[in-house]
C-alpha cells in the first residue's frame, strides 16, 4: 500500500487522479449493439449471448419452481438458518423506512395530500462470476417486498453447473416471484424491453460488472435503476486506540472483491500506519483470493497520515466512501462530522462484513464519490409519491387572483384562463 503525506490538497489531488471511470467508448458501443439485438430478436438473442459469454446452451430461460425448491433443500441447514437470521435483521431495519401518506385540510375547502404507491414490477440482477452472492439477493429483494412490489423478477447468469444453489435458496427465502438464468448486458436489456419469456420491469437493481453497469446506464429513462455501481471501497479512520490487525482484516475484506477495489486507511498515527502495513502483508499470505487482494492493495490501496483529526475527516468527506469505519476512541462523538459516506461502522467491533451480511442496513451503497448525493438502497427506492389536491369553488375564489397574476407574469394565458373561466357567470 502506498503511503501519502503532505498537504490536504496534494493528497486529494492524487486520489482524484486515480478515481477515473471504468467504462469506455468501446464497451458502450458493444453494449448498445447487444441491447439493440435483444430489443429486435428477444429470447433468441438471450440464448445466443448465453452460449457465447457463459458457455451454456439453454433450452429454457425460466428456472422452474421445483428446481428452486430442490436447491433450497440441498443447501446446508446451518447456512439456511444464518440466512433466516440475516433476513429478520434486514426486514426489521427496512420496515422502519416505510413512508407515510398524509392528508392536509387546514384551509377551509382545501384538501391536499400525498399517497405512496409501490412500483408494480422490479428486476433484480444477481452477479455470477468468481463468487456467489446470496446476500445481494436479500439486500435487493427484501426492501422491494416491504415496499409492496407485487412482481419481483430475478436474473442471474448460469454456469455449466447451473445456478448456484445458495443464490436460489436466498431467492426462495426472500420471496422472488420469477428467476431467469440470464446475465450480462443482454439480461439488463431483457428486463428493460421485455421478451416473450421475460417481462418488462419498471426498475432494475443489483450490482454487476462494467458491461452490466453500462447497460443500466443505457436503459435508464426507459426504466429506473438503483445506481451505477463502481468497484468496492472502504475507508478506515484510526487513531492510536485502534487495533492494526482489525484494520488490516477490514481493508482486505474489500480488497478481495475486485482488483479495482479501493482500501484506504487514514490515521494520525505513524505507528498505526506502519503496524497496519505489516499486519496486512501477513494476513494477505493466507487468503484464498490473495492474487486479487494483493493487486487491489498494491494498485489502489492507500495509507494516509494526517496532522489532525479534522484533516482526517475533511479528506474522508471528499472521498465520500462506500464504506466508512471509524476506529477512533469514543467513535459516536464523531458521527456529526461525517457528511458523505454510504454506510458507517462505529467502533472496533463494527466490522464492515457485519453490514455486508447481517446487521440490517442495506449493503447496496453509492460508490466512486457518489455518496455526496446518493443514498443506500432502501424501501423508498421501490415506491413513488403522488400528490392530490381538491378545492371547493369558494376556496378557489380566495386564491384565484394570485394564481392569475403568477400565470400572466409567466406569459401563460391559458393557465390564467383555466382559473378565470370557473368564475364566469354562465359557469
From Swiss-Prot:
GO CC, alphabetical: cytosol
- Write down the CDD domains for this protein, in alphabetical order: Histidinol_dh (cd06572)
Query: Is NAD set as a keyword in this record?
Result: yes
Record's keyword annotation contains Zinc: yes
Cite the annotated pathway: Amino-acid biosynthesis; L-histidine biosynthesis; L-histidine from 5-phospho-alpha-D-ribose 1-diphosphate: step 9/9
Q: How is the cofactor bound?
A: Binds 1 zinc ion per subunit.
Q: Which SUPFAM superfamilies match?
A: ALDH-like (SSF53720)
The first-level EC class reads oxidoreductase
Cofactor names from the entry are: Zn(2+)
Described purpose of this protein according to its UniProt entry: Catalyzes the sequential NAD-dependent oxidations of L-histidinol to L-histidinaldehyde and then to L-histidine.
Protein name in the entry: Histidinol dehydrogenase
Q: What is the protein's species of origin?
A: Listeria innocua serovar 6a (strain ATCC BAA-680 / CLIP 11262)
Q: Which gene encodes it?
A: hisD
Amino acid at each position: 500500500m502506498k503511503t501519502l503525506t503532505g498537504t490536504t490538497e496534494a493528497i486529494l489531488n492524487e486520489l482524484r487522479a486515480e478515481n477515473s471511470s471504468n467504462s469506455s467508448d468501446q464497451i458502450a458501443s458493444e453494449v448498445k449493439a447487444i441491447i439493440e439485438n435483444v430489443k429486435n430478436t428477444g429470447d433468441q438473442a438471450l440464448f445466443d449471448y448465453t452460449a457465447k459469454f457463459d458457455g451454456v446452451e439453454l433450452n429454457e430461460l425460466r428456472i422452474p419452481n421445483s428446481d428452486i425448491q430442490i436447491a433450497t433443500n440441498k443447501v446446508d441447514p446451518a447456512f439456511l438458518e444464518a440466512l433466516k437470521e440475516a433476513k429478520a435483521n434486514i426486514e426489521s431495519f427496512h420496515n422502519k423506512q416505510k413512508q407515510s401518506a398524509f392528508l392536509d385540510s387546514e384551509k377551509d375547502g382545501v384538501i391536499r395530500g400525498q399517497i405512496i404507491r409501490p412500483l408494480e414490477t422490479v428486476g433484480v440482477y444477481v452477479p455470477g462470476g468468481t463468487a456467489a452472492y446470496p446476500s445481494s439477493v436479500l439486500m435487493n429483494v427484501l426492501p422491494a417486498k416491504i415496499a409492496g412490489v407485487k412482481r419481483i423478477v430475478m436474473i442471474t447468469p448460469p454456469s455449466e453447473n447451473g445456478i448456484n444453489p445458495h443464490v436460489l435458496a436466498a431467492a426462495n427465502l426472500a420471496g422472488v416471484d420469477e428467476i431467469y438464468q440470464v446475465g450480462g448486458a443482454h439480461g439488463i436489456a431483457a428486463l428493460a424491453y421485455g421478451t416473450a419469456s421475460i417481462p418488462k420491469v419498471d426498475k432494475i437493481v443489483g450490482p454487476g460488472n462494467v458491461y452490466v453497469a453500462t447497460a443500466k446506464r443505457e436503459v435508464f429513462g426507459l426504466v429506473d435503476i438503483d445506481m451505477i455501481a463502481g468497484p468496492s471501497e472502504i475507508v478506515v479512520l484510526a487513531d492510536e486506540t485502534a487495533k492494526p490487525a482489525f484494520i488490516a482484516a477490514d481493508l482486505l475484506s474489500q480488497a478481495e472483491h475486485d482488483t479495482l477495489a479501493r482500501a484506504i486507511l487514514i490515521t494520525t498515527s505513524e505507528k498505526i500506519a506502519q503496524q497496519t502495513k505489516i499486519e496486512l502483508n501477513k494476513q494477505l499470505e493466507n487468503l484464498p483470493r490473495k492474487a486479487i487482494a494483493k493487486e487491489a492493495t498494491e494498485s489502489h490501496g492507500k495509507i494516509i497520515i494526517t496532522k489532525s483529526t479534522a484533516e482526517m475527516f475533511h479528506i474522508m468527506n471528499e472521498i465520500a466512501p462506500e464504506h466508512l469505519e471509524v476506529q477512533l476512541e469514543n467513535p459516536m462523538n464523531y458521527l456529526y462530522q461525517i457528511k458523505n459516506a454510504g454506510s458507517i461502522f462505529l467502533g472496533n467491533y463494527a466490522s464492515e462484513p457485519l453490514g455486508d451480511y447481517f446487521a440490517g442496513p442495506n449493503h447496496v451503497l453509492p460508490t466512486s464519490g457518489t455518496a455526496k448525493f446518493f443514498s443506500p438502497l432502501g424501501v423508498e427506492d421501490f415506491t413513488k409519491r403522488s400528490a392530490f389536491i381538491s378545492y371547493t369553488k369558494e376556496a378557489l375564489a380566495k386564491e384565484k387572483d394570485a394564481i392569475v397574476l403568477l400565470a400572466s407574469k409567466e406569459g401563460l394565458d391559458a393557465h390564467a384562463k383555466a382559473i378565470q373561466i370557473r368564475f364566469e357567470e354562465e359557469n
